[in-house]
């Protein structure tokens, strides 16, 4: 057997582009796949996601990579082996984030501590259901460590009564409901707003949105079991608290109107499953709220308490965050009391392929993307322009058919068009929902200092 040189992971990580040679690892072997990049059946953009790192997390997304002939093909490109003394660094016991779970290396990280990341655009619209490991992650605080056997969900009932449920009781006492729903962060596409004027918040690209099949108990069933009535006459809210807390002990919290929480058509879940498996730690194991059609900030994670209040949640994330303002409001004049908390989100769409600046061969080009609207409103059309909005074509929509008012999941869309050599394309998309809401054509009129609700035509 030939003798191969040894490399550290740091050395492998320096090889991330064709100019520097594209290296990857599989097991303890190192491969130079530069000459295979353009031959990759999934396209060069997919294999380059693993450049400088391990293939396994990406191969796990597609079963074909487990075939023997794929491994045989890879062996042709072997150039070395990982140094045997390579080992992961020990966690820092003083770091409050030291107990956070491992993450998929393909995620585009916007903040390491707390961890906030989105899937690469190239993979975002590849599947209707987002793989758990690529689902966008929005954490405000360290990920709590929860022992399933000791977990209790507290529901503060009427008259001072309290319902305490273990994970097993939540599973056994209430029928399991399943809902396919898209969750989107209020700051999705914030980076586009920051190009107009600076904003405060994480620089999300188009990936702070993902879709999963959620399973769990109906919030309505649990609240009725706790003794609450079907309707209340005031402006009550159902408030949620998570197990994630700041250094002062204040938990993440949010709330939704009582009518939505109790509506059988709103499909609000206390979810314990995600795409057929238990919730991953980053996605709120063991229980999270899923509020379909509503901004992701209200789908509280690592749920510990549910209560009914005459007012909205007092949490700062409900009162002093996730609100939209006029472009004329700045940090000297902003008053969070004057704006309602975001609940249902406006219609949204984005192009996921091709990526900006990509060179495409002449012939046929398939443009892909996603579209979604809040409040259960179905996306009825996506218009795509190749010339900056001067002329338009209608894309083909793909997705699940849902009852009126309960279109909780996104639509994926694509459009195949002829492209001549030497043509420069300015691809634009805009979506229309069942209420004929349509995206605004530019960012400037909807700019706001927090960079939320960024829904202009995607260019």
Swiss-Prot record:
Which residues are recorded as binding heme b? 40, 65, 69
> Which residue stretches belong to region Disordered?
83-115
Question: Where is the stretch described as Hinge?
Answer: 86-95
Q: Which UniProt keywords apply?
A: Heme, Iron, Metal-binding, Mitochondrion, Molybdenum, Oxidoreductase
Question: Where is the segment annotated Homodimerization?
Answer: 324-459
Regions of compositional bias (Low complexity) in chain numbering = 85-100
Under CDD domains, the record lists: eukary_SO_Moco (cd02111)
Q: Where does Mo-molybdopterin bind?
A: 136-140, 185, 244, 283, 288, 299-301
Q: Name one GO cellular component term.
A: mitochondrion
Catalyzes what?
sulfite + O2 + H2O = sulfate + H2O2
Query: Which co-factor is required?
Result: heme b; Mo-molybdopterin
User: What's noted on cofactor binding?
Assistant: Binds 1 heme b (iron(II)-protoporphyrin IX) group non-covalently per subunit. Binds 1 Mo-molybdopterin (Mo-MPT) cofactor per subunit.
- Residue ranges, annotated region (Moco domain): 96-323
Q: According to its UniProt entry, what is the function of this protein?
A: Catalyzes the oxidation of sulfite to sulfate, the terminal reaction in the oxidative degradation of sulfur-containing amino acids.
Name of the protein this chain belongs to: Sulfite oxidase
What is the protein's species of origin? Answer: Gallus gallus
